[in-house]
């Protein structure tokens, strides 16, 4: 049969005690659901069919004690095949198996195994032996179980080693990340400190500039009166004004000399009888007489004479 359901309805009719014979049934697939409904069928014969694979849920038929899968086209067994922990007898004669799943090591109750006529891996083929009789098949079961346990242990060690490598790599990544984050924090901290210092300097510079600006008007106000009061004495008179005073002084001096000369001539020489000299002498006498009666002049003359 090419479909699992074509004969699924009469599986119970094939059940003989605890044995269910589905050999030579032209099966391409295993009727797992129907088999799961027959937990009494602890002995299952699926030999001489066209099975190339077993579904993963086949491993849920944990009630199986004896299983015949010989003369099919099986290329591999499910990864969870070791779940069939009650299996004691397993016939895999004449299939296309190269290796067995690691979980095979869990079949602790397996007592009989036939792996003849399979393209097994050379190491596994050497362990399995020839399986030519009952004794060799029992030895095959024992040796293959021991071999698969060793393979399982090796794989577990390899898995643990990979996990350790991954953990170490993760630790290194975490340490690297932490170092990177610490470096970034330190960089941010330094940048923040530099920014704070820059702002402080700007603030101090602004305060200093403000103080200078406040001092500058005071200096100007303090210096302004000094410049006004002190500049006048130092300021030289215009040259033109100096020249005028010099000329005026010269003229006055010349006039005084002329007056004095004329006065001397009129009083000493023989010209004193002349009308002009008579007038000059009269003016001089009146002036001297008036000055003598002046109170201030008298006080000055007395003071001078006392000294």
Curated annotation (Swiss-Prot):
Superkingdom assignment:
Eukaryota
Q: Which residues carry this modification: N6-succinyllysine?
A: 73
Segments for region (Disordered): 150-242
Cellular compartments annotated = Microsome membrane; Endoplasmic reticulum membrane; Nucleus envelope
Q: Does the keyword Acetylation apply?
A: yes
Cross-referenced Pfam families, in alphabetical order?
LRR_1, LRR_8
Keyword list, A-Z: Acetylation, Coiled coil, Endoplasmic reticulum, Leucine-rich repeat, Membrane, Microsome, Nucleus, Phosphoprotein, Repeat, Signal-anchor, Transmembrane, Transmembrane helix
- Give the record's GO biological process terms: intracellular signal transduction
Q: Which residues carry this modification: Phosphoserine?
A: 23, 25
Which residue positions does N6-acetyllysine occur at?
135
Q: Where are the transmembrane segments?
A: 245-265
Residues exposed to the Cytoplasmic side = 2-244
Placement of LRR repeats on the sequence: 10-31, 40-62, 63-84, 86-107, 109-128
Under PANTHER family, the record lists: LEUCINE-RICH REPEAT-CONTAINING PROTEIN 18-LIKE, PTHR48051
What biological function has been recorded for the protein in this entry?
Answer: Required for nuclear import of FGF1, but not that of FGF2. Might regulate nuclear import of exogenous FGF1 by facilitating interaction with the nuclear import machinery and by transporting cytosolic FGF1 to, and possibly through, the nuclear pores.
What is the protein's given name? Leucine-rich repeat-containing protein 59
């Amino acid at each position: 049969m090419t479909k699992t359901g074509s004969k699924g309805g009469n599986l119970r009719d094939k059940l003989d005690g605890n044995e269910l014979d589905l050999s030579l049934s032209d099966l391409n697939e295993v009727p797992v659901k129907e088999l799961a409904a027959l937990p009494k069928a602890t002995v299952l014969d699926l030999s001489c069919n066209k099975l190339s694979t077993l579904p993963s849920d086949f491993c849920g038929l944990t009630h199986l004690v004896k299983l015949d899968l010989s003369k099919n086209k099986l290329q591999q067994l499910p990864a969870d095949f070791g779940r069939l922990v009650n299996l004691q007898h397993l016939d895999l004669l004449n299939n296309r198996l190269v290796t067995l799943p690691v979980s095979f090591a869990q079949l602790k109750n397996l007592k009989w195994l036939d792996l003849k006529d399979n393209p097994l891996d050379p190491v596994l083929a050497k362990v399995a032996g020839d399986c030519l009789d009952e004794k060799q098949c029992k030895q095959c079961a024992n040796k293959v179980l021991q071999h698969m346990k060793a393979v399982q242990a090796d794989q577990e060690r390899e898995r643990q080693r990979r996990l350790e490598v991954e953990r170490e790599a993760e630790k290194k990544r975490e340490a690297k990340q932490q170092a990177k984050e610490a470096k970034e924090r330190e960089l941010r901290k330094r940048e923040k400190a530099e920014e704070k210092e820059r702002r402080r300097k700007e603030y101090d510079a602004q305060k200093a500039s403000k103080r200078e600006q406040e001092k500058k008007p005071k200096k100007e106000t303090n210096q302004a009166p000094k410049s006004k009061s002190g500049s006048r004495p130092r300021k030289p008179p215009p040259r033109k004004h100096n020249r005028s005073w010099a000329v005026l002084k010269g003229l006055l001096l010349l006039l005084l000399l002329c007056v004095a000369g004329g006065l001397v001539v009129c009083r000493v020489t023989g010209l004193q009888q002349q009308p002009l000299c008579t007038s000059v002498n009269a003016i001089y006498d009146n002036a001297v007489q008036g000055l003598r009666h002046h109170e201030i002049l008298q006080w000055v003359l007395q003071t001078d004479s006392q000294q």
